[in-house]
Amino acid sequence: MDARRKHWKENMFTPFFSAQDVLEETSEPESSSEQTTADSSKGMEEIYNLSSRKFQEESKFKRKKYIFQLNEIEQEQNLRENKRNISKNETDTNSASYESSNVDVTTEESFNSTEDNSTCSTDNLPALLRQDIRKKFMERMSPKLCLNLLNEELEELNMKYRKIEEEFENAEKELLHYKKEIFTKPLNFQETETDASKSDYELQALRNDLSEKATNVKNLSEQLQQAKEVIHKLNLENRNLKEAVRKLKHQTEVGNVLLKEEMKSYYELEMAKIRGELSVIKNELRTEKTLQARNNRALELLRKYYASSMVTSSSILDHFTGDFF
């Protein structure tokens, strides 16, 4: 793909003429065509300088913003590590605080130096360190917030990608326009070498600009692919969490049903025991009532017998005393 893009760029920006071709031409250009060519070259140079300054300013601002965020994350991590060391080693609090202050000063100085020379700081900062800091920062965030942040970064990368594509297309159109103008208008023999070198310089500058933009597009595409992979991973984790919650809910429902059945069986068993004990007590009470009734009848019979025996004995005694007297 890179070879095809390079071949396409070479075909697109191949000059239509060289110094030798111009020297071999015998046509004499007019003064009006010379003035028009000079004006078009000057306008082309002004447009390129304006677009180049604008792109450099935007790149500088974005680098400053990204470096400021990285420095804030590094400073926060250093402060947390220092606090952790202070809590572990209470005897070394002074040295730990001194180290944390040195870290703050060094980070502030590094931020100021990167603010003065932002184009070099991003190149000097290792890519692995930036990835490690970004990974730790993403791990501390919740999955939902991380997903929202990645969606925002994805939208921002898409906007940057579209903007760079538009700038790339506009630059191609401008190149085609100026190449057609230069090809259709004759050049002065005396200014041919100067104009050719200037045009080559401008074309080379535009090639470099387009190459840089193509690199930016490639980097943005890689970042976009990484963001998509992270989003896919988070979606899988979210799906797994939902499945785990569903299983846990199902287990809870099954446990509740089993607990209800167990409580019901225990209640029925206890009620059966109580009914059995109640029936035993009723039987004992019935037996006791029967025995009491039997005893009452026996006492009644005994009372009657005793009363009758007393009457008989008194009559015998009276008869005996009468006979005696």
From Swiss-Prot:
Name of protein: Coiled-coil domain-containing protein 160
Family: Belongs to the CCDC160 family.
Keywords assigned by UniProt, alphabetized: Coiled coil
The keyword Transport is annotated on this UniProt entry: no
Coiled coil start-end: 144-288
Ranges of compositional bias, category Basic and acidic residues: 81-91
Organism: Homo sapiens
Region (Disordered): 18-45, 81-123
Stretches with biased composition (Polar residues): 92-123
